């Protein structure tokens, strides 16, 4: 099965061995609790509209991708709020890149297979990590 990311009319094929690391950890329910003045537990719960994290990552030295594709992904990541269609093995999501609250959290991470000094678009990188957030209806 394939993994693709589409921006407008441009579709990029992503490495098929990417693993959706946080697929089963997200909850569609937001909940908060507090105590009333008589000690009664008050629970507020509601359905979330978007915001699901989608982290696709390679395992070890897998998830090879060429530098040219990485450059395209990097250009897309530099467009704030850019909505894209992510197809993960037949499931389609509208996503934006997740830049995270910290400088250490990057939307795209990878390692060079061989670190050439004169990099070419055909050079390969591995251990790819792509961080997305599923866009809400109102984003």
Give the location of each predicted region.
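Extracellular/virion structural assembly segments
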Residues: 1-139
């Amino acid at each position: 099965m394939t993994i693709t990311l589409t921006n407008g009319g441009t579709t990029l094929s992503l490495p098929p061995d990417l693993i959706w690391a946080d697929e089963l950890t997200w909850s569609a329910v937001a909940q908060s609790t507090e105590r009333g003045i008589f000690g009664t537990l008050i629970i507020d719960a509601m359905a979330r509209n978007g915001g699901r994290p989608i982290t696709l990552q390679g395992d070890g030295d897998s998830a090879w991708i060429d530098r040219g594709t990485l450059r395209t992904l990097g250009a897309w990541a530099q467009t704030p709020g850019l909505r894209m269609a992510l197809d993960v093995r037949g499931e389609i999501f509208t996503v934006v890149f997740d830049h995270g609250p910290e400088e250490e959290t990057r939307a795209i991470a990878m390692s060079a297979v061989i670190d050439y000094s004169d990099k070419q678009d055909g050079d390969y990188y591995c251990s790819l990590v792509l961080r997305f957030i599923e866009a809400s209806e109102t984003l």
